[in-house]
A protein has these predicted regions:
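Catalytic adenosine-cofactor/nucleotide-binding cores of aminoacyl-tRNA synthetases and other
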Residues: 240-245, 266-421, 497-524
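Basic, alpha-helical terminal appendages of large translation-related enzymes
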Residues: 1-15, 29-30, 56-58, 153, ...
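A short glycine/serine-rich beta->alpha loop
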Residues: 24-32, 231-237, 476-481
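N-terminal Rossmann-like or analogous alpha/beta NTP/dinucleotide-binding catalytic cores
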Residues: 1-153, 248-249, 255
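A generic secondary-structure signal for well-formed alpha-helical elements
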Residues: 45-48, 52, 117-124, 149-156, ...
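Short, histidine-centered active-site or binding-site loop motifs used for metal coordination
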Residues: 21-26, 230, 305, 460
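Active-site cores that bind ATP or allylic diphosphates and position pyrophosphate for catalysis
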Residues: 118, 122-286
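Short amphipathic alpha-helical segments and their helix-coil junctions
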Residues: 124, 228-229, 285, 346-365, ...
Length: 524
């Protein structure tokens, strides 16, 4: 059984209605690492629907969280906003300076991320956390937290193993400068929390408004209770023993809520580097990734891996292998058979679940996502055909396409061209057809190979110009020359590409002009 289906089955024991949640702090540009949580939750939501449950998928934005430091992409003038909730900070302009006309900091970084989510079929119900504070939904939770201050203090210390300061208070009010930093609580008289800030200014915050917030461990537990959350996958930092998940469960119960099922996911790492981090510069933005990775492939990267296994995200050579795996699954989906062992049945369900959950829409036909053309073949065509119409004409000639290309195939070609023209495309997969045989390539071709190439050049003049016929002509010419297929292919790669490897040789040759190819092959 796929991990998302297993989660849905487990959640069904709680009841017929589920609220599956994920969240994010909009402190900077998002990266693909964030999609582990987003897609894990969204796939569980879909699995719940497929299981016959009612389910909402909610995306909670931590817009009440403060700016913690001045990031590299911000100007030093943001120093004055440290400690201020992200919803209350102006967005940065192109020069990194605060832009009063640019909306809020939180919205500035959230908007492109939500657009990216749409492209991969994720359209959640969005809740801005500062609005939940502002409309008073947190008020009862805040009052309960303050009233039960000692109990919560004990939970956090006993579960996390860390000691809280003597003046710890389960609510952080905003000071006179709008910052959460350096503010000390002096009293509570519902609905007001009284305080004195670092400038010595005294004031009070109304818990019915967004004039302060609960500390993270209590805030998380409170929102579970407020929104009736039944499932919220969390990263291994929050899910570790003594982490915020473990403290959140008893705190949520204390606040009158029913805590969600604990589900923990591993992080995504950029291949050859550490976990993705916006602040450390180890990042691929979601818009950048989606400009080069087909959405189904991106979803498949998440869907095929259990939540507790880390993922190495690779936009280089590994993309071909991932696409190959996905295309094999779509072209020949496994089916259960009576004679199968239990282990094989589980494998079949897992793979079919991964294929199902990789689609942009729940009702999509997986074969439509491939568009009848393999990722590798499209890569070759995108490099040797300068315009899209030439690609479509080629696909019609080869039988891959009849009529006009479907939207998914057009999108795939667009992304392929972006990938090829960018920094992520693997050097070893680049194709440049040689107009003449270079000296280095010529020096690697022995007499037996020359004889094969001479014979092949003559036979290419009369063979049908399609992949199958050219492939058979290459093999028969190699056999008649006493040359093995591998050596024959290497010879052709050297002549055509100037190196000893490349895409499927018959596919490549079929895309070339007959006279030009014969001229290069016979010139050896």
């Amino acid at each position: 059984m796929h991990w998302a289906d297993f989660a849905a089955q487990k959640l069904s024991e709680r009841g017929e209605t589920q609220v599956v949640v994920s969240g994010i702090t909009p402190s900077g540009e998002f990266h693909i690492g964030h999609l582990r949580e987003i897609l894990s939750a969204e796939m569980i939501h879909r699995a719940c629907l497929d299981f016959g449950l009612e389910s909402r998928y909610v995306f909670i934005v931590d817009s009440m969280d403060p700016l913690r430091r001045v990031y590299d992409f911000l100007s030093p003038s943001y120093e004055s906003y440290i400690g201020v909730p992200l919803a209350n900070i102006p967005a940065p302009g192109e020069d990194g300076e605060p832009d009063p006309e640019g909306g809020s900091y939180a919205e500035f970084f959230l908007r492109p991320f939500l657009e990216a989510l749409k492209q991969i079929g994720v359209e959640p119900e969005v809740i801005m956390n500062h609005e939940t504070y502002q409309n008073g939904e947190f008020a009862e939770m805040i009052d309960l937290a303050i009233t039960n201050r000692d109990e919560i203090h004990g939970i956090i210390e006993s579960v996390s193993g860390r000691e809280l300061p003597e003046d710890w208070f389960p609510y952080s009010p905003l000071g006179s400068n709008g910052s959460l930093d350096g503010v000390k609580v002096t009293g509570y008289d519902r609905p007001f929390v009284h305080w004195i800030d670092g400038q010595g200014i005294e004031g009070k915050s109304d818990i019915r408004l967004a004039e302060g917030k609960l500390p993270w461990r209590i805030d998380w537990a409170a929102r579970w209770a407020i929104h009736g959350v039944t499932c919220e996958p969390a990263g291994k930092d929050h899910g570790a023993a003594g982490g915020s998940y473990d403290t959140g469960i008893p705190i949520c119960e204390l606040l009158g809520g029913n805590p969600p099922e604990k589900m923990v996911y591993e992080w995504i790492q950029l291949k050859g580097m550490g976990p993705m981090s916006s602040s450390a510069g180890v990042t691929i933005g979601p818009m950048e990734a989606l400009s080069i990775v087909p959405p189904e492939i991106l979803r498949y990267v998440i869907a095929r891996s259990k939540m507790n296994r880390h993922i190495e995200f690779d936009t280089g050579a590994m993309m071909f292998l991932t696409a190959d795996e996905y295309e094999r699954l779509v072209s020949n989906p496994p089916n259960e058979e009576e004679a199968m062992s239990k282990r094989k049945r589980i494998s079949v369900k897992t793979r079919r679940g991964a294929m199902r959950l990789s689609q942009i829409s729940r009702d999509s036909d997986p074969s439509d996502s491939v568009g009848g053309v393999s990722f590798r073949h499209l890569s070759m065509l995108a490099q040797i055909k300068s315009d899209d119409d030439s690609v479509w004409s080629s696909l019609r000639r080869s039988g891959h396409l009849s009529g006009e290309p479907v939207t998914s195939l057009r999108s795939r070609l667009e992304k392929m061209r972006s990938w090829i023209g960018g920094d992520h495309f693997p050097e070893g997969s680049k194709i440049t057809i040689q107009s003449e045989v270079g000296e280095e390539a010529r020096s690697q071709i022995d007499e037996d190979s020359r004889s094969f190439l001479e014979l092949l050049a003559r036979r290419l003049e009369s063979c049908d110009w399609n992949e199958d016929s050219i492939g058979e002509t290459v093999r028969s010419s190699a056999s008649d020359s006493g040359l093995g297929n591998r050596q024959a292919y290497v010879s052709l790669y050297l002549v055509i590409l100037g190196r000893d490897y490349g895409p499927r040789i018959s596919s490549l040759m079929a895309e070339m002009d007959r006279e030009s190819l014969i001229g290069v092959v016979s010139s050896i």
